[in-house]
Amino acid sequence: MPVQRRSYRYPEDYEDVGAFLVRTYAATAAGPHRNWLRPRWEYMHYHPAIYGRESEFERCGLWTDGNRIVAAVHFEHRMGVVYVQLDPMYASLKRDLLTYAIEHLSGEFKAGPAVHVYLDEDDAGFGVVAESLGFAKMSEEQAEVTTRLPASRVPEQVHVPDGFEVLGMDEDDDVAKVHRVIHRGFDHDGEPPEDELDDRRRKLSAPGLR
């Protein structure tokens, strides 16, 4: 059976796409095209920017081989800003994925309707396909940097200063505390805005959060 293309159905396909990302971790970790990690997929769905817009998910595309998802093309929070997830065994789909983005995921920008697709800079072949379809490389200022820490490099024990302790969200799920930590972690001064607490609570409601 040839690879089939269809719309992403939320919430029915949500877990299956997450499993697809996990399945392709090992195959894509070294590039040239690196897929999202599953936590970002969850964050995308539980971010307040998407609240009330869930019907727009049907514009995203999935490619399946039998019952297996082998590729996905989707926006995150802004229509027209697009990401590609691809099983490396199906590299021949690259042109189809980008064509789908052009036809279904265009957004409105200051210069008019457009599609911005983030591709891994190590995947020169994907870049060639994009250029053949009329895409132009964005400036370095518009690049998106992703940092990953291999599990093998995570220390078994974490030492913190006296008076501090490391707790999991299952031990202390005080949303206000987490909101304050993240606010300070992004180098903001003062206390976090209280009117953002519900938005933070929504983000923290993602089922895979630890």
Residue ranges of predicted features:
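Conserved N-terminal entry element of GNAT/NAT acetyltransferase domains
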Residues: 1-28, 136-137, 145-172
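Conserved donor-binding loop and adjoining core beta-sheet/short helix segment
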Residues: 6-15, 21-108
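Alpha-helical elements of the RecA-like P-loop NTPase motor core of helicases
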Residues: 15, 127-128, 176
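Exposed alpha-helical structural elements
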Residues: 16, 38-40, 125, 195-199
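Long, contiguous binding/interaction regions
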Residues: 18, 25-29, 39-45, 76, ...
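Charged/polar, solvent-exposed surface patches and flexible loops
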Residues: 19, 23, 84, 103, ...
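Flexible, substrate/cofactor-facing loop regions flanked by secondary structure
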Residues: 30, 155-210
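Acyl-donor-binding surface of acyltransferase catalytic domains
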Residues: 69, 76-162, 170
